[in-house]
Design a protein with these regions (language model features):
Chain A
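N-terminal export signals
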Residues: 3-5, 11-29
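Extracytoplasmic/periplasmic substrate-binding proteins
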Residues: 45, 57-58, 217-221, 225-226, ...
Length: 443, 306
């Protein structure tokens, strides 16, 4: 015989309610919040070494400002991040500040899901428009209103293995890679490196894979060098110059055909091969620098090679935005601007991650200039090839993925450059005819 | 509800009882809490969604202008919508068949195993208790990875389980079957245990073999359960989203994107709530058709059996 358990229905109901209450209040009060602190909620997508450095900067800010508590939330990069920001902004109870990609600004409905930046408050914390790289500051506006505070630019760069390049006789007397101009010099350099590697492809980049954007990044570094553009200023006309676009694509195919680049590496494999000195060159964004240093690869970095004229390189920029809030607490708002100003003014610390500060005073700081190899490619900040300012562009956008998918088979030879360009143009036309969720004028 | 007027003090006991009975018969007061929640969280959003599907509203709630059937016209001309609808149908067929047959097979097995029944029950039903995120991440990161995954390691193969467009859907189905077959198994097991034992005894006396008993007693007695399981399974499979979103994100090359993910993509990631609502209503109509067809089928069967 067993006694029935001594729990009445009322006990159970009461107990569950108490538990629910405890759970709800547990959600509302984050650990570490002192009662007198102002809480600033900050969302970002910075992972790996970027994330570690950002976390350190947030910690340093907290030490200098004991009255402010920064609640740092790291979310998954890419589409899921922009989905969450939009949802938070739509609800009007969003984080106080968020990291964002500049090229995404035109697509998020600035003014509806994002709140404008208050220039007076920005001046109060010591930031002036003239402090920022002019083309980037310009792009931080949408319909004439400032919606973003620029933080950095992260251009395509060229990583090179110093040991392998030395063996191939490619380094100058200063130990740096001898810069190349035009197709022939670059091909010559790659052929020499190929010999040292025993015939293995000397160059790797993200060339293949699901949703790969690497081929887009390479193409949009090469093509703008000859002055090529994608869209007219207002985004209404395709302005692709077929000849220039095909020149860039044929060059990419030539790299694959001659075995100078490896068309079968996806993002991870390209970084792994360069890390293990199985390739002499890596074309990638500037953010791999910390990881490569940690893993002890003998490497340095320089600007993306100039092949078709200028030294342009595909880039996007990290910026800070204020997702829309229905009621912004003035005290929290002030603390938010303080926090943004702290991060921007300490851009030299951030540059350790590889990114080029868009805050111009930071570019002159001895701390930054001493960073090797992160300061080697700083001059690119005036040559960045940013996405056209239309709603379907930006990091991890449909445009990048469509163009990446169109050009990936060109490198491996499964598709001719002409077919690749036709596929890209068809995708661009599809994107242009798709309805903009935030039309410029109410129709 | 007209009988709920306050009864005068002179009411006879008989009348009082009558008032009480009809009051509890309606029971409206008791279901009001449920009805309020049902209306607020199901009926109202459903109607709101229908209205949204005729507008171009975005995620910020602006651009809310009436566009008539433009969203539906766009959806019917949208190859990615058709592709995702097709994927949902393929998944439904590929998953429902093994989920029903395997559920029955496992139930028969456990029903006839005479030792450690609790262990078999637990093993087959256990996975069903796991949340979708746990299941998806376990398969994504431990079983399917091409280089170090359990599956390729065991088979000694080099297969891109989730990366090959022609295989990805099968892999998703395999995971889903492992995860959810336990529910059908449990329903079948309960049904098996409620088949009266004397039928089998009588059959044994008549000299029926095990196969005869299965074919002529067990399967017919399970008919209603099978019908129920098929309905539940079809509806569950048509609503597939979690495991695909978590394991493949709809890829590779859109080979696994179900229609619900497409609605999510165009609505929450693409910010076009109006268009997403139209896509959702296309699925809604499909589910209503399946349910109606099922109802008709049931009614016919019930008439035949009576």
């Amino acid at each position: 015989m067993q006694d029935p358990p001594f729990i009445t229905r009322r006990h159970l109901l009461g107990g569950s309610l108490a538990l629910l209450g405890a759970a709800a209040s547990g959600c509302a009060i984050p650990v570490g919040l002192g009662s007198s602190q102002t809480r600033v909620k900050y969302w970002h997508f910075l992972g790996a070494s970027d994330g570690i450095i950002m976390n350190r900067m947030v910690g340093a800010f907290a030490q200098d400002n004991p009255g402010i508590f920064i609640e740092e939330n790291v979310l998954a990069w890419g589409e899921p991040y922009y989905t969450k920001i939009a949802m938070a902004g739509a609800g009007g109870r969003s984080p106080d500040v968020a990291t964002f990609h500049l090229a995404r600004l035109a697509g998020i409905g600035a003014g509806e899901l994002l709140d404008p930046i208050n220039l007076d408050l920005l001046a109060e914390v010591g930031l002036q428009p003239s402090d920022f790289s002019p083309p980037i500051w310009e792009r931080a506006h949408y319909k004439g209103t400032l919606y973003a505070v620029p933080f950095d630019a992260h251009p395509m760069v060229q990583y090179y293995n110093t040991d392998l390049c030395e063996q191939a006789g490619l380094l100058g007397p200063d130990g740096k890679l001898q810069p190349t101009t035009g197709q022939d010099q670059l091909l010559d350099q790659l052929r020499k490196a190929k010999q040292v590697l025993g015939g293995k492809p000397p160059l790797v980049f993200d060339a293949l894979g699901l949703g790969t954007v690497g081929p887009w990044r390479v193409w949009y570094s090469l093509y703008p060098q000859s002055g090529g553009t994608l869209l007219s200023e207002d985004g209404s006309q395709v302005t692709i110059d077929d000849q220039k676009a095909l020149d860039a694509l044929r060059f990419m195919r030539r790299l694959g055909e001659e075995g100078l680049c490896d068309p079968t590496t996806d993002y991870g494999a390209s970084v792994a091969k360069f890390t293990n000195s199985e390739a002499a060159f890596l074309w990638n964004g500037d953010w791999e620098v910390t990881g490569l240093k940690e893993r002890g690869t003998p490497f340095s970095m320089g600007r993306f090679p100039s092949v078709f004229g200028s030294g342009a390189a595909q880039a996007d920029c990290h910026v800070f935005v204020l997702p829309h809030q229905r009621d912004r607490d003035p005290e929290v708002e002030r603390a938010t601007y303080q926090f943004i100003a702290y991060l921007v003014k300490n851009s030299a610390d951030w540059a350790v991650a590889g990114h080029v500060p868009s805050y111009l005073p930071a570019l002159q700081e001895p701390d930054y200039l001493a960073l090797q190899p992160q300061s080697e490619y700083r001059s690119v900040i005036t040559d960045v090839a940013l996405d056209p300012q239309v709603w379907y562009t930006g990091s991890a956008s449909r445009l990048w993925i469509e163009f990446g998918g169109a050009f990936s088979p060109v490198i491996s030879g499964e598709r001719t450059p002409e077919e690749g360009l036709a596929a890209a143009k068809a995708a661009l036309n599809r994107l242009m005819s798709a309805p903009n969720p935030f039309p410029a004028e109410e129709r | 509800m007209t009988t709920t007027v306050a009864a005068p003090a002179t009411t006879s006991p008989a009348e009082k009882a009558q008032v009480k009975r009809s009051w509890t018969q309606h029971g409206l007061l008791f279901v009001i809490p449920f009805l309020l929640i049902y209306v607020a969280f199901l009926v109202w959003p459903t109607l709101l969604g229908l209205r949204m599907s005729f507008t171009d509203v975005n995620i910020a709630g602006s651009n809310d202008r009436f566009v008539g059937f433009a969203n539906y016209a766009e959806a019917f001309a949208d190859p990615r919508m058709w592709r995702s609808l097709w994927n949902t149908l393929v998944f439904t067929v590929l998953s429902t068949v093994p989920l029903v047959i395997l559920g029955l097979a496992l139930a028969l097995l456990v029903h006839h195993l005479r030792f450690m029944q609790w262990l078999w029950r637990l093993s087959f039903f256990g996975p069903f208790l796991l949340p979708s995120a746990v299941v998806s991440i376990r398969w994504l990161q431990m079983i399917y990875p091409p280089e170090y995954g359990l599956l390729n390691g065991t088979l000694g193969t080099d297969i891109l389980w989730l990366g090959d467009p022609s295989l990805a859907m099968w892999s998703v189905v395999l995971t889903t079957v492992w995860w959810t077959v336990g529910f059908n198994f449990l329903l079948y097991l309960a049904a098996l245990q409620s088949i009266p034992q004397h039928l089998y005894e009588a059959a044994s006396i008549d000299g029926a073999s095990a196969w005869d008993k299965l074919r002529s007693i067990t399967l017919p007695m399970l008919g209603r359960t099978t019908a129920l399981i098929i309905v539940l399974q079809l509806l569950a499979s048509l609503k597939v989203f979690d495991q695909i979103y978590l394991m493949t994100g709809g890829g590779p090359e859109d080979a696994t994107r179900p229609i619900i993910e497409y609605a999510y993509d165009v609505g929450f990631t693409g910010y076009r709530i109006g268009y997403a609502s139209a896509v959702s209503y296309i699925l809604f109509v499909l589910i209503v058709i399946v349910s109606l067809a099922q109802l008709r089928l049931f009614r016919k069967r019930a008439e035949v059996s009576s």
